[in-house]
Every structure is written in C-alpha cells, then in structure tokens.
Amino acid sequence: MTVSGAIPSMTKNRTLVVGGTGFIGQFITKASLGFGYPTFLLVRPGPVSPSKAVIIKTFQDKGAKVIYGVINDKECMEKILKEYEIDVVISLVGGARLLDQLTLLEAIKSVKTIKRFLPSEFGHDVDRTDPVEPGLTMYKEKRLVRRAVEEYGIPFTNICCNSIASWPYYDNCHPSQVPPPMDQFQIYGDGNTKAYFIDGNDIGKFTMKTIDDIRTLNKNVHFRPSSNCYSINELASLWEKKIGRTLPRFTVTADKLLAHAAENIIPESIVSSFTHDIFINGCQVNFSIDEHSDVEIDTLYPDEKFRSLDDCYEDFVPMVHDKIHAGKSGEIKIKDGKPLVQTGTIEEINKDIKTLVETQPNEEIKKDMKALVEAVPISAMG
C-alpha cells in the first residue's frame, strides 16, 4: 500500500529533548512547544550559566517541563522514560557527549516504549561524507550511534539539515550569531561549489513534523530546497546587494583550510574540516537520494515553503548597525578578526568603517578597502 501523506497521531507524542537549550536545540524545543507536543527538557544537574537559566525559564513559561538527569546513566534514563511516559526522544548533545548516546540507547532498548529516536545529527549525512580530522572523528562517533540504533531495532529518524542560514565562517562554530563580513569576503576554493542553507526555525519546524510521520520512519530526512542552494560567491553577491556596497574577495585555498583543521584547535578546527568538506569536496550536493533509505522534506511537505536565504540575510542588516560595546565612544571593536559596526548617523557609520580601513594591517587590502569606501558610501544602504 502506498502512503500518500502523514498520518497524524490522535494524541500528541510526549517528547523528551536532550540538549534542548543548545544552539540547534532551542529551535527544536521552540517548535515542539509551538506544535503543542508535551515537551520535556532534560537538563544536567548542577549550576547553569545565567544565559542558560534564562533560556530554561523561557521554555518553562511556555509549558516545557524540566527534568534533571544525564543520558550516560542508564538507570536514571530508564526511570525518566517510564515515569514521564516518553514517546519520542530527540538528542542534540554536543560533540564531546556524542558517545553518551550509547547509554541512552541501552535505556531506550530496555523500556521498549519509545516510538521514535532522533540522534544528534542535524547536519550532513555522516554515512556519505568523510571530512578530514578532527571532523572525521565526530562523524565516526555519529556512525557508531547509527549502527547501535539499527542493531537494537529502535525506530529512528536521522535529520540531515545541512548548513544553517548564515555566512559560513570557517573558524566560527555558530555563524548565524555573527553577521556576514563588512570588510572582505573569504572565498573557499573557486567559490562555485554549492550548499544548502536552512533557517533555524525551519529546522525546528520540519523536524517536529517528521516525528509522527510514518514516511520518515527509519529514514534519513534531507533538507535540500533548491531555493536555498547557493555557492559562496552567490552568498557574497547576496550580501553585497543587502548592504549596497561591493567588498573585495580573497581566496582561502583548500590547503589553508586543511592547515587550519590540522592545528586541531577544538572546536575551530572541526569547523574548518567541515568547511573544506562542504565547499571543496561538495559533500552536500555530490550524491543522489536513495529512495529506500532517504526522503526529502520538499517531497514530504510540498506545500510547506522554506524561508528564503534572501529573507534570512535581511535579518543581518540591522546587526551591522548595532551599537558596539566599547570603552570609548566612536571606537571600533574587532572580535576574532571581524568588525562590530556601531549604530548612529550615516556620518558616524562611515567614520567607523573608515577607522576600520585605517587599522587594517595589510596594506594591499587597506588600499582596496579605502577605494571601495570612497566609491560606495554607506548611504547606499538606505
């Protein structure tokens, strides 16, 4: 029999989110609550940072129930899964805790009541790509989790949502929290290899749509909207259109990315290894969907649209006008080699950009930037 659509549950699945206060986890938790699922957040016992405390309180106010526990304690997890009658477990644990999921899987296997498990993937299809180290170690650990899920016969869905909608800095873990460059573009390789860029809220929304959809049972779910498939050259042009100015482009070679990855600075080198895999190897676009093991979001929900990358980049425009928190008025602040541009009048913003130009240590780049600033004033941004 052919299943033509999703089969909704009569009752909402009770969903446990592990790592629900993290970067991607917040999108998942928000969507779970938005869809009306009884949502439980697993939080590690002990003190939390003020920022995480705010996140937890916000989700509690929206109806989430906080459960304290750790996934590498089988007895603890068995008790939680039984006591709260959990139906779905979504894991978003970070790289250092990926193998802790193996203990969680033992608990899931023991209770025998979990309808769906979503492991901590939320990126590439780890069985189809081989980044250099140190990223490869992370993928090997994710593969171990996949194999354990299959061995235990646990119903699963692997979310392969590719890249977050942002500028892909090769040395930044969460680039969507940083605006695209205002001084120069770093172009990886020839800049023409494409990748898929997905808004965080879409990752949350579509993930939650899959958890009780029979068509996603024991499948890899791929986020590959053609509308959001861009090369880094195309990303640069999109951002230039947004800010009304042309920025110089400089090539970051494959060797440069590999060298940065080889430095083994965690987590920055992991990001470099993934950047190389995406923009040099083309890991997001160099394979075809296997109808037996894969499904695409576009096929599952053809009437549901992804937020466009053009719209996503609109969110970054106000960020380049935000006031910098500097010790002296009018001071330009550089963080991790990236400018934080302050708000103010057009004259103030132009002054800050010119200050940035004058502090550029590379004379050749400074010359190019100065010419661009004089040719295209900030007033073009509107």
From Swiss-Prot:
InterPro entries (alphabetical): NAD(P)-bd_dom_sf (IPR036291), NmrA-like (IPR008030), NmrA-type/Isoflavone_red_sf (IPR050608), PCBER-like (IPR045312)
Pathway: Flavonoid metabolism; proanthocyanidin biosynthesis
Chain segments annotated as transmembrane: none
A Gene Ontology molecular function term of the record: leucoanthocyanidin reductase activity
Keywords assigned by UniProt, alphabetized: NADP, Oxidoreductase
Catalyzed chemical reaction(s): (2R,3S)-catechin + NADP(+) + H2O = (2R,3S,4S)-leucocyanidin + NADPH + H(+)
Enzyme class: oxidoreductase
Record: residues binding NADP(+): G19, G20, T21, G22, F23, I24, G25, R44, K52, R146
Superkingdom assignment: Eukaryota
Active site location: K142 (proton acceptor)
Assigned EC number: 1.17.1.3
Pfam annotation, one family: NmrA
Any single biological process term in GO: proanthocyanidin biosynthetic process
Key word Nucleus present: no
Presence of the UniProt keyword NADP in the record: yes
Gene3D superfamilies recorded: NAD(P)-binding Rossmann-like Domain, UDP-galactose 4-epimerase, domain 1
Subunit structure: Monomer.
PANTHER family per the UniProt record, alphabetical: LEUCANTHOCYANIDIN REDUCTASE, PINORESINOL REDUCTASE-RELATED
Family: Belongs to the NmrA-type oxidoreductase family. Isoflavone reductase subfamily.
Function noted in UniProt: Catalyzes the synthesis of catechin from 3,4-cis-leucocyanidin. Also synthesizes afzelechin and gallocatechin.
Descriptive protein name: Leucoanthocyanidin reductase
Organism field: Desmodium uncinatum
